[in-house]
UniProtKB/Swiss-Prot annotation:
Organism whose genome encodes this protein: Zea mays
EC supergroup of this enzyme: hydrolase
Taxonomic lineage of the native organism: Eukaryota, Viridiplantae, Streptophyta, Embryophyta, Tracheophyta
PANTHER family: DNA REPLICATION LICENSING FACTOR MCM FAMILY MEMBER, DNA REPLICATION LICENSING FACTOR MCM3-RELATED
The protein's name: DNA replication licensing factor MCM3 homolog 3
Keywords: ATP-binding, Cell cycle, DNA replication, DNA-binding, Helicase, Hydrolase, Nucleotide-binding, Nucleus
Length: 768
């Protein structure tokens, strides 16, 4: 846009008056001095200060920035030259950027409409692509050997605010037709780079493609951000003509010409805590049932799975990340995988994480590729230059990645996330680009067993079918089984029926996991933090007593609690907790080495030791403590033992003690109740997580599973399909540390026959 000299001078005087008056009590004059001292060439002006000085000027800068960018630059350059005449070379000027509140002009890429073209806007989003930094010629110098004269020429494109655009062709002859030689060393260039900015994933409209806007940055703004960074960019929104000259199609490409780039905190959309919120958080952290309370508050529409819900709470809280002086990075994020039969609410748990976690990105195994999860090098359609494009895990930096149907992913694509899950970085070395991007995220995956349904006669490792190199990167691996028990099925059906009958006063359906479930918390910041008891929703048979009427937090308060504990509490290990962790890890290693019943779901490696530390730290965060105590380690071991041995166990010593007690009780009272013994925090609300033991023969669920595993391994190893009961009894007692009585063997075989897994006739057991 061409502006007459009088208007330019008037605009320049307005900015000089602003700098002279300096409403910030010397702030801008000091900023100019610092800029001159540090050899920088950009001054950032706050819009609030400009409004306080001259409201009309601030409005005109936003509405028609093309008229004011160069006068503002000239004014600042004049002030800088007065401070230091040698600061700027001939033809150089100080660039100006803007910051502060922009009102309606603070938008996301989805809100950028044609009405904003030609105005200054502040756009917030996440960087998805970055081009290489290229030089752009500003002034070319040519020498004529015939006349001995130098000829210079300036170049301006559509992105320039100074004058009209010029051609981009180098002159080869002067006005008299003499040949010219370009003096490249005397030419002037400036750096430029193209970014692609996309709206943040958590604010994307469901069912719609995310919107993207191209951003052009120049000079000192290049390389100020990388893919995966959340940024706020202030610039002028412009429409550029198409590549073909003389195009009359009316379709233009829009870009944002940036003058200020600010990196946003990952928690830019953090909730606001009131004094009452902090008081209630401390009250909840002091309760003895804090762990159960948060677990029950997560996904209340899902029946049971209390231990898995507890693990998800710890995953969202995470441990403490450590970066040592020698460059070693110790991750604090927790990775978790669920493997089990279909229709056991694995995917629903992932959706619950999407609703609660501040930043969560969902993907599927079949719909994702290795480069789509990590990063890719792509080619620009117009210029053909290479670009680095961030994948889902880079975009979810400091968040959670939910991967459903993990077993459907190709092996090559699955290997691509090995580095992310342990080192938490994505390293790219292809097409001449070598880069390392941060991907500090937790991974929660759901998968089906290799045979579709879980085969209890096989070991967990054979059912899962994934390599140990990948399994060891998961801190927790849960086996979720669909058990056929009439009592459990009745309770689940009642729970599902209550959800379908639960309606609002006007007859509409009410959401259980979203804000509708916490509607009493919407209108008042000091509203109750617990979900109001509803007879239709919660039922009448409440096994956990009267207090269970208020045993679920509202979704809004649960988000606040998790965000506060995750980001503002950084616990450290105490000596007592460290000793207990070392002892427990040694016992876990010893137990896995001596296991004869197929072992657990995960190999016990050095990564398991770090898992215990991360889980203990997450539990300390949940209790809002700044130190990790022995009780936190014990709670972490309960979750870890349940994940490894899929039983509600406490410490391994207590598990062995219970086996001895049940064995002694069986000798004295054949009809006594055995079953499974509740560990810390076990709940009658959680039947799907625990195999139901026998009440008649006093055989624990663990011994039943160990028996079935021994029988399955023996049958597969010897390629036989039938055995006598005497042979089975001798075999299991030979392989097991605790012997089985004849009545216990017959009872377990009858259970297997009822499940159509074996057929017994005349003392011979045939494997089906």
């Amino acid at each position: 846009m061409e502006i007459n000299e009088e208007a330019m001078a008037a605009h320049k005087r307005a900015f000089l008056d602003f700098l002279d008056q300096d409403v910030g009590k010397g702030v801008y004059m000091q900023a100019v001095r610092d800029m001159v001292q540090n050899k920088r060439h950009r001054l950032i002006i706050g819009m609030d200060d400009l409004r306080n000085h001259n409201l009309d000027l601030a409005r005109r800068v936003i509405r028609t920035p093309g008229e004011y960018m160069q006068p503002a630059s000239d004014a600042v350059s004049e002030v800088a030259r007065n401070l230091d005449p040698k600061f700027l070379k001939e033809g150089e000027r100080v660039m100006v950027g803007f910051s502060g509140p922009f009102g309606f002009h603070r938008v996301t890429p989805r809100d950028l409409m044609s009405s904003f073209i030609g105005t200054m806007v502040c756009v917030e989003g996440i960087v998805t692509k970055c081009s290489l930094v290229r030089p752009k010629v500003v002034k070319s110098v040519h020498f004529c050997p015939v006349t001995g004269d130098f000829l210079s020429r300036e170049y301006r494109d559509i992105t320039s605010f100074v004058g009209l655009p010029t051609g981009s062709v180098y002159p080869t002859r002067d006005d008299n037709g003499n040949l010219l030689v370009t003096e490249y060393g005397m030419c002037e260039y400036k750096d430029h780079q193209t970014l692609s900015m996309q709206e943040v994933p958590e604010n994307s409209a469901p069912g719609q493609l995310p919107r993207t806007v191209d951003v052009i940055v120049e000079d000192d703004l290049v390389d100020c951000c990388k893919p995966g960074d959340r940024v706020s960019i202030v610039g002028v929104y412009k429409a550029l003509p198409g590549k073909s000259k003389g195009s009359v199609s009316g379709v233009f490409r829009t870009v944002l010409i940036a003058n200020n780039v600010s990196l946003l905190n990952k928690e830019a959309n953090a909730p606001v805590y009131t004094r009452e919120d902090l008081k209630r958080m401390k009250e909840i952290s002091r309760r003895n049932d804090t762990f159960d309370l948060l677990g029950n508050s997560l996904a209340p529409s899902i029946y049971g799975h209390l231990w898995i819900k507890k693990a998800v709470v710890l995953l969202m809280l995470g441990g403490v990340e450590k970066n040592l002086k020698n460059g070693t990075h110790l991750r604090g994020d927790i990775n978790m995988m669920m493997v089990g039969d279909p229709s056991v609410a694995k995917s629903q748990l992932l959706r619950a994480v999407m609703n609660i976690a501040p930043l969560a990105i969902s993907t599927t195994g079949r719909g994702s590729s290795g480069v789509g999860l990590t990063a890719a090098v792509t080619s620009d359609q117009e210029t053909g230059e290479r670009r680095l494009e961030a994948g889902a895990m880079v975009l979810a930096d400091r968040g959670v990645v939910c991967i459903d149907e993990f077993d459907k992913m190709n092996d090559q694509d699955r290997v691509a996330i090995h580095e992310v899950m342990e080192q938490q970085t994505v390293t790219i070395a292809k097409a001449g680009i070598h880069a390392s991007l941060n991907a500090r995220c937790s991974v929660i995956a759901a998968a089906n067993p290799i045979y579709g349904t879980y085969d209890r006669s096989l070991t967990p490792t054979k059912n899962i079918g994934l390599p140990d190199s990948l399994l060891s990167r998961f801190d927790l691996l849960f086996i979720v089984l669909d058990q056929m028990d009439p009592e459990i099925d009745r309770q689940i059906s009642e729970h599902v029926a209550r959800m379908h009958r639960y309606c609002t006063d006007d007859g509409g359906a009410r959401s259980l996991d979203k804000e509708g479930y916490a509607e009493e918390d919407d209108g008042d910041a000091n509203a109750a933090i617990f979900v109001k008891y509803d007879r239709m929703l919660h039922g009448q048979d409440r096994r956990r007593g009267k207090k269970s009427k208020q045993d679920r937090l509202t979704v809004k308060f649960l988000k606040k609690y998790i965000h506060y504990a995750k980001n503002l509490i950084q616990p450290r290990l105490t000596d007592e907790a460290s000793d207990h962790i070392a002892t427990s890890y040694a016992e876990l290693r010893d137990g896995s080495a001596n296991a004869k019943s197929g072992g657990g779901t995960l190999p016990i490696t050095a990564r398991t030791l770090e898992t215990i530390i991360r889980l203990s730290t997450a539990h300390a965060k949940m209790k809002l403590r700044h130190e990790v105590l022995k009780s936190d380690v014990e709670a972490a071991l309960q979750v870890l033992n349940f994940a490894i041995y899929h039983k509600e166990l406490t410490e391994m010593e207590e598990r062995e003690q219970r086996e001895m007690e049940m064995k002694q009780q069986a000798d004295h009272d054949a009809g006594a109740t055995g079953g499974t013994v509740d560990g810390h925090g076990s709940s009658g609300n959680d039947p799907m997580d625990v195999d139901v033991g026998s009440n008649d023969q006093n055989v624990s669920a663990e011994r039943i599973q160990a028996f079935e595993a021994l029988l399955g391994q023996h049958v597969l190893a010897n390629h036989i399909d039938q055995m006598s009961i005497d042979e089975i009894e001798q075999m299991v007692n030979r392989e097991s540390t605790a012997p089985y009585t004849r009545s216990q063997v017959e009872f377990i075989l009858e259970r297997m026959q009822d499940a159509n897994r074996v057929m017994i006739r005349d003392g011979v057991v045939r494997i089906i």
